[in-house]
C-alpha cells in the first residue's frame, strides 16, 4: 500500500490527523511500511485494508510524536525532567486501539490463550 492511498483515506475519513500531517512524506512512507509489516505478523489471516493500515500507521507516528495523545496511549503519569512515562497497564500497547477493536487479539495472543486453555483441560477417567 502506498503513502498516497493512506493519505487520501485520512483526508476523507479522519478529523484527528495531526500526527500524519506533522510528519514529512518520508516518515509517512516509513510509517505505512512499518504498519503493514507489523500487522502482517500480528494478523496473518486478515487482508490489510486501508483503514486498518492507516490506524496502525498513525499509531506508529503518534508513538514517536513528542506530543503524545496521553489518554489514548493509556498514559498514567509523565515526568518531564526525568523523561519518564508510565502506563496504566504497564506499557503502551504495540497494536493501535482502533486496530485491536476491529481485529481483536493478535495471532500470538490467540496462541497463548489456546496454550493456557490446553493446560487447564482436565481429562476424566474411571477408577477400577
Enumerate the predicted regions with their spans.
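Divalent metal-cofactor coordination and adjacent catalytic microenvironments
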Residues: 1-128
Amino acid at each position: 500500500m502506498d503513502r498516497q492511498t493512506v493519505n487520501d483515506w485520512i483526508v476523507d475519513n479522519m478529523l484527528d490527523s495531526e500526527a500524519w500531517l506533522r510528519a514529512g512524506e518520508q516518515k509517512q512512507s516509513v510509517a505505512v511500511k512499518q504498519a503493514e509489516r507489523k500487522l502482517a505478523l500480528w494478523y496473518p489471516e486478515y487482508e490489510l485494508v486501508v483503514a486498518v493500515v492507516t490506524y496502525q500507521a498513525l499509531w506508529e507516528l503518534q508513538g514517536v510524536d513528542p506530543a503524545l495523545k496521553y489518554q489514548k496511549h493509556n498514559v498514567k503519569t509523565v515526568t518531564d525532567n526525568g523523561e519518564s512515562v508510565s502506563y496504566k497497564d504497564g506499557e503502551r500497547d504495540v497494536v493501535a486501539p482502533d486496530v485491536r477493536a476491529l481485529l481483536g487479539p493478535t495471532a500470538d495472543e490467540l496462541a497463548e490463550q489456546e496454550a493456557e486453555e490446553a493446560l487447564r483441560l482436565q481429562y476424566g477417567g474411571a477408577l477400577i
